[in-house]
Amino acid sequence: MNKENASKLWKIIQDAGDYLEGQLPEHPNHPKGRNPYAHVALCVKDKFSASYKDIPDEKYNEVLEYIQFLKQNPS
């Protein structure tokens, strides 16, 4: 992904993390609470098999849609 799109995507991931703060269900591996920013970044990495910076530009809109899905479906 080009630098401009990667920068935009990182900001969107941060905004999604802000939105999900306190909304993720509890998990025994995270007794002090879950990190919503890491959750979003890890979900993106798992779905696209690459860090957000390494996803092709052609999938930018697909990544945006997936982040929106994560916001609507905290898990």
List PLM regions with ranges:
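Positively charged, phosphate-engaging catalytic surfaces used for nucleic-acid and nucleotide handling
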Residues: 1-75
